[in-house]
Amino acid sequence: MDQIRLTHLRQLEAESIHIIREVAAEFSNPVMLYSIGKDSSVMLHLARKAFYPGTLPFPLLHVDTGWKFREMYEFRDRTAKAYGCELLVHKNPEGVAMGINPFVHGSAKHTDIMKTEGLKQALNKYSFDAAFGGARRDEEKSRAKERIYSFRDRFHRWDPKNQRPELWHNYNGQINKGESIRVFPLSNWTEQDIWQYIWLENIDIVPLYLAAERPVLERDGMLMMIDDNRIDLQPGEVIKKRMVRFRTLGCWPLTGAVESNAQTLPEIIEEMLVSTTSERQGRVIDRDQAGSMELKKRQGYF
């Protein structure tokens, strides 16, 4: 491959497709974690390219908390149907029985039970030995030091001090029974790369990424979009219509919007050129405590 003649986006694309094909060939039962966000959309697009004109040789897995935006659920089902993907949806039955929700139990407990434990349940249920994730190194400091092939023990835990060297695009996928690998094909992409690639490839995304007038209220320094009636307003809180969009998507009570007028992909790309903050600044779960993301990943988080 002539690296000099490839644009940086095509180099990233080629690297990601190589990783996806390597995993499909090397592991017996891989799965692609599908969170419905922009990174998942890019990863799914790359996987479809990797095996075109055939179908994906692995299913998609969505770990559902029951608190995603309604537009995300609609997009998930429409996308899986349009591309003919096998879609597995898992919701932690114990969490559902306990009535876990982010307002009553807080973001840390909600995330641990509905996302981390839910994910581990699904991986155990289907005996997946490799799981693709859409995490990128530029998102957050614990992800910055994680390998593309992220080794997990039989309890799905990550030990940042026990990572394997990855030299010259050679990946060590050797695991023992019960162990697994999380694989991050987008590790070397930036948020700007993701948006430029979405524009270049005309990839469909959830409309929440584009600015529009939406009902929001300010709570704990975050602009919370009110997506349904499962919220009790606190004294003095007022729901107002404001021009906002989302840089990252998750559970609607835990994902802050940003004020923006970017209604098209070129406008988002232009906005990113002058941005000085991480896209995850609106994620409440990242602020639960110092080193929050690394602690979650050590316990088995995405």
UniProtKB/Swiss-Prot annotation:
The keyword Cell wall biogenesis/degradation does not apply. One of its GO terms (molecular function) is ATP binding. Keywords: ATP-binding, Nucleotide-binding, Nucleotidyltransferase, Transferase. It holds the Pfam family PAPS_reduct. InterPro entries: PAPS_reduct_dom, Rossmann-like_a/b/a_fold, SO4_adenylTrfase_ssu, Sulfate_adenylyltrnsfr_sub2. The keyword Transcription regulation does not apply. Coiled coil: none annotated. It catalyses: sulfate + ATP + H(+) = adenosine 5'-phosphosulfate + diphosphate. CDD domains: Sulfate_adenylyltransferase_2 (cd23946). Heterodimer composed of CysD, the smaller subunit, and CysN. With CysN forms the ATP sulfurylase (ATPS) that catalyzes the adenylation of sulfate producing adenosine 5'-phosphosulfate (APS) and diphosphate, the first enzymatic step in sulfur assimilation pathway. APS synthesis involves the formation of a high-energy phosphoric-sulfuric acid anhydride bond driven by GTP hydrolysis by CysN coupled to ATP hydrolysis by CysD. Belongs to the PAPS reductase family. CysD subfamily. This is Sulfate adenylyltransferase subunit 2. It comes from Escherichia coli O9:H4 (strain HS). The gene is cysD.
